[in-house]
Amino acid sequence: MRTFFSLLILVFTLTDISAQRKYVKPEFVKNWSKPGKHPDHIVLNFSEDPATSISVTWRTSKDVKSGYGEIAKAHANPAFISRAETIEAITETINYSNVVSEYDRDNPKSNKFITLNHNYHSVTFKGLEPNTVYGYRVGDGEIWSEWIQFKTAHKENAPFSFLYVGDAQNYILELWSRLIREGYRKAPDASFIIHAGDLINDAHDEHQWHEWFMACLLYTSPSPRDLST
């Protein structure tokens, strides 16, 4: 009996020590969140009629002066990419002022601010067939993203599922990403995802935005964010 109580005390003591352990936040490599020539922050967006059209946006460095989207009906045979249609994208340079360049979550007053110029590209694929799987990729004609699949909506009313999440805000990539994975595990055929509430803590923090994109764009369903605050 004495041995049992000794072991019990040891277990509770170790549990308490483990619970008190200081959390070590992850370090990000320099320029981790900055765009380059390879497309990132790729988002599939609803268009006027999701049964016959869909829009895509993505980000690059300002060195990439133009962009293109390619699309084709997707099949198990990878030869489908040989039938892809190429659409020229609209490219815009966006100037961001007061962007956090050196990020310290625990001491925000120490953050340093800079101005950034990034290029954003957008393309709308039209004339698609309802309830059909397509593959698409985006790039500048030489440097491309991977091929990403989506399915157009039914033309008539039909049941569908979607994910609704809110207030990502804190520990976005390191912890909130679990929610996205679990959501798609429970609803693997979700047609889209709605983000409500506070997506990040600081609208001018490039690191937080990149965390958000990295966390939720593990999946490429249409991702409306109109309900965010």
Task: Tell where the protein language model's regions lie, with residue ranges.
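Sec-dependent N-terminal signal peptides
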Residues: 4-12
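Conserved small/polar residues in nucleotide/adenosyl-binding loops
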Residues: 219-226
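Active-site beta-strand/loop signature of hydrolases that rely on acidic residues for catalysis
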Residues: 58, 190-202
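Acidic, histidine-bearing metal-coordination/catalytic regions of metal-dependent phosphoesterases
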Residues: 19-164, 185-186
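C-terminal segment of classical bacterial N-terminal signal peptides
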Residues: 13-17
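Active-site metal-binding loops of divalent metal-dependent hydrolases
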Residues: 166-169, 197-199
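Active-site environment of divalent metal-dependent phosphoester hydrolases
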Residues: 171-174, 201-205
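Metal-dependent catalytic neighborhoods of phosphoester/phosphodiester hydrolases
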Residues: 203-214
